[in-house]
């Protein structure tokens, strides 16, 4: 767990965008070399880059990488119960993952830069607008699967209680193993308003 914490801190404090996006470089170079030529400059592809190497217009931020960031933090939360990991899950889900799909669900981004410019002095590898077909077609199905599974991240049950992980108007009715039925309603206009009201309609007797 200590090694995973070290990786998490490096990503979130030095290699992640404010949107939860990560993997800033499509093509780049690394001074770390290779195992057989440690002093050489090595070409890298689809990588995190150096600390704070977070360009805006040329950011790669592949949609699949942003989903991977969500999944990594979800596993870290399941292991520890620490809410800081769910903060990243929420950030990715509502920002860097949603940006990868159009409102009508028919066009997609492979990359998710923070700034689009028509005046760059060079050509980028991927389109600057969402398109219906991407030659590397991993991101569209991955995005749809993640959005269809979003409700699975909303709540978590544990022996100690229930975690409300994501804010959003919804209802929950579930059986809490040997404790009985739990039913609640969450009312909110989040993210447009910050007020959240949770009403417990049925509470297990053993809770």
Whereabouts are the PLM-identified features?
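Glycan-recognition and catalytic cores of secretory/periplasmic carbohydrate-active enzymes
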Residues: 1-207
């Amino acid at each position: 767990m200590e090694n995973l914490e070290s990786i998490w801190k490096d990503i979130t404090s030095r290699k992640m965008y404010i949107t939860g996006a990560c993997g800033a470089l499509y093509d780049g170079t690394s001074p770390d070399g290779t195992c057989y030529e440690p002093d050489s400059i090595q070409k890298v592809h689809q990588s995190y880059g150096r600390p704070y190497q977070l360009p805006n217009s040329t950011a790669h931020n592949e949609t699949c990488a942003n989903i991977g960031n969500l999944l990594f933090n979800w596993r870290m939360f399941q292991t520890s119960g620490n809410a800081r990991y769910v903060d990243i899950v929420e950030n990715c889900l509502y920002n860097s993952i949603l940006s990868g799909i159009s409102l009508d669900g028919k066009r997609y981004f492979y990359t998710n830069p923070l700034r689009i410019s028509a005046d760059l002095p060079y050509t980028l590898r991927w389109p600057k607008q969402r398109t219906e077909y991407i030659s590397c077609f991993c991101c569209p199905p991955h995005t749809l699967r993640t959005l269809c599974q979003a409700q699975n991240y909303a709540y978590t049950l544990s022996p100690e209680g229930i975690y409300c992980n994501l804010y959003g108007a919804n209802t929950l009715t579930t059986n809490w193993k040997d404790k009985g039925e739990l039913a609640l309603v969450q009312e909110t206009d989040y993210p447009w308003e910050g007020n959240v009201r949770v009403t417990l309609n049925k509470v297990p007797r053993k809770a």
